[in-house]
Curated annotation (Swiss-Prot):
One GO biological process term: phosphatidylinositol phosphate biosynthetic process
Cofactor: Mg(2+)
Keywords tagged on the record: Hydrolase, Magnesium, Metal-binding
GO molecular function, one term: inositol monophosphate 1-phosphatase activity
Name of the protein this chain belongs to: Inositol-1-monophosphatase
Family to which this protein belongs: Belongs to the inositol monophosphatase superfamily.
Reaction catalysed by this enzyme: a myo-inositol phosphate + H2O = myo-inositol + phosphate
Entry binding sites for substrate: 83, 106-109, 206, 235
Chain residues that bind Mg(2+) 2: 104, 107, 235
Sites where the protein binds Mg(2+) 1: 83, 104, 106
Enzyme Commission number: 3.1.3.25
A Pfam cross-reference name: Inositol_P
Length: 291
């Protein structure tokens, strides 16, 4: 069966279905591959990617393969960009109105390896390099966050479907701020120095370990704001849309060129967005962080 409709709501339904199925697969495969013990998993199931601290597991690659197989059945004419399997070099250069699916089979792989229950499957549909639908499925909790352009965001869990709205906070000093760190040692040091300057101007800071979940937490009002440098498109393609459709102010990197040009992502409740950007600007936090 194929689903040819490019309507955002139809694409959202596909994203939800794919993310939900993939999350169930990840849940089962973790127990099969790593057992039920918590703590870091080792052996041949884990290897390093960009740095020794940047892991990828056999479950990442298997899950992306599952997602690609399902999309080949449902959307055979669409392009696919996956964290593990690659895809179009420039998402803005695909033919007009072509749908590109942006996949992160496990966002939060370090958490996954250590048995920390903050990792998710992220599936987004983009047209001309802009997300129009997306879903983020929390593997352990079973929640599925989703959005479609212009149609709002919601979360589905054991209690049903709830509309997502970001927080109403209007004072940066009372904001709970999320952030994350790159894998490069040099970049991490610079990010830590920036965070040390940001910490006194907000209520407190959380580091969840999954950009997709950070953005969904902004959408749900569980974080008031989030910023992170060097975020890849597959990390934020679905979550940023979900946050924006929940009312957050979202700033994304300009991606005019080859994929891999990661950049700064900011999402904040509208009442503190300007103040957050001003604080980041004051500490030179809007500039790229390079090796």
């Amino acid at each position: 069966m194929t689903v040819p409709d490019n309507d955002p709501e139809q694409l959202r339904c596909v994203a939800e279905s794919l993310a939900t199925e993939a999350a169930a697969f990840v849940r089962c495969r973790r127990a099969e591959v790593f057992g039920t013990d918590l703590g870091a998993a080792g052996g041949g199931a884990v290897r390093a990617k960009s740095t020794p601290t940047d892991p990828v597991t056999v479950v990442d690659t298997e899950t992306e393969r599952l997602l690609r197989d399902r999309l080949a059945q449902l959307r055979p004419g669409d392009s696919i960009l996956g964290e593990e399997g690659g895809g179009p070099a420039d998402l803005t250069a695909t033919p007009a109105d072509t749908v590109t699916w942006v996949l992160d089979p496990i966002d939060g792989t370090v958490n996954f390896v250590y048995g920390i229950p903050a990792y998710a499957v992220s599936v987004a549909a983009q047209v001309d390099g802009v997300s129009v639908a997306g879903a983020v499925a929390e593997v352990v909790a079973g929640r599925v966050h989703s959005a479609a352009s212009g149609l709002g965001a919601h979360v589905t869990d054991e209690y049903g479907v709830q509309v997502l709205r970001c927080s109403a906070v209007d004072d940066l000093s009372m904001a709970l701020l999320g952030t994350g760190f790159a894998y490069s040692v040099v970049r991490r040091a610079a990010q830590a120095a920036l965070l040390a300057q940001m910490l006194p101007v907000v209520r407190d800071v959380r580091r969840i370990g999954s950009a997709a979940l950070d953005l969904c937490m902004v959408a749900a009002g569980q974080l008031d704001a989030y910023y992170e440098h060097e975020v890849q498109v597959w990390d934020c393609a679905a979550g940023a849309l979900i946050a924006a459709e929940a009312g957050a102010c979202v700033q994304l990197p300009k991606r005019n060129g080859p994929v891999g040009g990661a950049g700064l992502v900011v999402a904040a409740a509208p009442g503190i967005a300007d103040a957050l950007l001003a604080a980041l600007q004051r500490f030179n936090g809007l500039a790229p962080i390079l090796d």
